[in-house]
Amino acid sequence: MIMTELRDLVGKPLKYVPTRSFVESSFFKALSDLKLNQLKLNTDTVSISGFMNHPKNLTKFQDYPILNLDFSSFELASSASSAASDENVEYKGTLLNVNTIEEFKAINKSDLLKQWGSLIYKSITEGDTTYRSVNQFFVLTFSDLKKYKFYYWFAYPSLQSQWTVKECKEAPSFEDETRKYLDTQEELEFFFAREQEEFCGLSKFLNGSKKVNEHSTFVFVDSCRHPGLYPGWQLKNFLYILARQGMREIRLFVYRYDGTSIMMKLQLDSIPNDIKFMGWERTKDDKLGPKLADLGSLIDPIQLADQAVDLNLKLMKWRISPQLNLEKVAQQKVLLLGSGTLGSYVARALMGWGVRHITFVDNGRVSYSNPVRQPLFGFNDCFSDEGLGRWKAPRAAEALKEIFPGVNSSAYNLEVPMIGHPVENEQSAKANYETLERLVDENDAIFLLMDSRESRWLPTLLGMAKNKLVINAALGFDSFLVMRHGTTTNNLGCYYCNDVVAPSDSLSDRTLDQMCTVTRPGGALMASALAVELLVSVLQHPEGAEADAKEHSFFGEVPHQIRGFLHNFSQTKLYAPKYTHCSACSQPVVDSFRSQGWDFVKNCLNDTKHLERVCGLEEVQREAERASEALLEQAAGLDLSDEEWL
């Protein structure tokens, strides 16, 4: 012990070492989650906790009391258990998070400190002298979740009482007795008394009958190792308690585990009549002001992107749509059959809604005409080592990961078996069928986005047989159709329910303008957007895919069909019931598929008449022919009767 340091304390006002905060980045991550998902626009205070190193574990570098906060600060505050241990000491805290930086700057800091300090004063007046109540901390924050900047300012409110150091010396024997007493305690006490060879808690001492005398000594367990031997800030409120009790002179033993303990005699300069508070933390430049944690450069870019993707979605729940179930949307596994114009735009819209699992299916290559209409492809995708364009599905999956690495995108270079196109290689066709069936089983929602009408038949049948949510989008030159197929329990029709013949080959013997997708470019964007929005609206409905077309949810309507027309810029919502003899979703077709599987599909691919016989369209056609013949006969009979008048 350097005697010069002891002499420097005598005859001067007692000084205290201010507390400093150390906030780990995990605390701000937890704060951003709390703000985004729970607090939203609410500015109610939140209970938190912090911790300091146990006094016996202080190092020579801890010359200031250091309050630590991390992600557990929120968890510990909400649990009944304490974080106190042989390693750390827990402190109670309160967080106030405001909504704007202007509010953070404009709030009256003096009034706020007084408001917070009054809570400590109330605890003292009610007889609660435990360190957790006497030395609470508070923090004012503003969270800029878009830029990942966090403004914060800690406060450690202290009630003012001025004391002068009259004597200062070492007390080895008292230090030994104090150590022995602390070793017997299950939980650390930071401030207690010793009277007539007996240690006791402060509240017990103050509530006892004994008066303070020359044998009374108060003990403060210090939480820092300042080279000037000044005690930590936590002592101030304990000394105020003594001053409030009318004590004018006291003996104070500042105990430190490193052997630098000192015994002081203190004298109160004046009776604290007015209640005054101090305690805003200063910056490293010793100025009053908040701190800034800019985590944008520290967070892993992929994690940063993951949080940013969800930010705008979660902001919807703050004011506009608090009931929105984003988790249900994000958990959807979506199968996109078609990776061209519609597939590209649908995938982008799905990612915008937070969907993370997207699977592409296509068997085409990127051509030079594609990139301007299909945003997942670029010029370099139009050629490869083979001299041909890259396969669309794998390239689309790669492009999604380039846009957002957190997406789980996969691809299958697969030719969907098409009705009206006889099977040429049964082994290959069956393998494609089995892969498609497995993909339908593994996914929750299926989008039909192919170029041809007949390629949608098998996915439509699979979706109905397996009761999946199927969204269909189709383009005309200046029109489009977006619809959701019915399920096994509702009465909504599918893409084929208005047909009286089975789908047939629409690709053979076509001119160039018939082979290419000749549409107004904006139609694909509109149809894709409506298709994804229809999916989300259905998911928000309590009945999901089973919802009737006329029903509403808090998120709006869930129509059956939306037909758009660009020539007059109009849209029409339509409803078409399930057709008893539909070639794709009627019960006879579904039952035949469930019982025969690939054999049924193969027979339909090879002979559309077989499908018409199963679903009943063949009989419908016969009835139509008989009705037509009857009308002709009737018309012929009328003509003969007319001749009688000639």
UniProtKB/Swiss-Prot annotation:
InterPro entries: Atg7, Atg7_N, Atg7_N_1, Atg7_N_2, ThiF/MoeB/HesA, ThiF_NAD_FAD-bd, Ubiquitin-activating_enz. GO terms for cellular component: cytosol; extrinsic component of phagophore assembly site membrane. Gene3D superfamilies: NAD(P)-binding Rossmann-like Domain, Ubiquitin-like modifier-activating enzyme ATG7 C-terminal domain, Ubiquitin-like modifier-activating enzyme ATG7 N-terminal domain. It holds the Pfam family ThiF. One of its GO terms (biological process) is cellular response to nitrogen starvation. SUPFAM superfamilies: Activating enzymes of the ubiquitin-like proteins (SSF69572). Signal peptide: none annotated. A motif (GXGXXG motif) lies at residues 338-343. Keywords: Autophagy, Cytoplasm, Protein transport, Transport, Ubl conjugation pathway. It is found in: Cytoplasm; Preautophagosomal structure. The active site is at C516. GO terms for molecular function: Atg12 activating enzyme activity; Atg8 activating enzyme activity; identical protein binding. PANTHER family: UBIQUITIN-ACTIVATING ENZYME E1 (PTHR10953), UBIQUITIN-LIKE MODIFIER-ACTIVATING ENZYME ATG7 (PTHR10953:SF3). E1-like activating enzyme involved in the 2 ubiquitin-like systems required for cytoplasm to vacuole transport (Cvt) and autophagy. Activates ATG12 for its conjugation with ATG5 and ATG8 for its conjugation with phosphatidylethanolamine. Both systems are needed for the ATG8 association to Cvt vesicles and autophagosomes membranes. Autophagy is essential for maintenance of amino acid levels and protein synthesis under nitrogen starvation. NCBIfam families: E1_like_apg7. Belongs to the ATG7 family. Homodimer. The GxGxxG motif is important for the function, possibly through binding with ATP. This is Ubiquitin-like modifier-activating enzyme ATG7. The lineage of its organism: Eukaryota, Fungi, Dikarya, Ascomycota, Saccharomycotina.
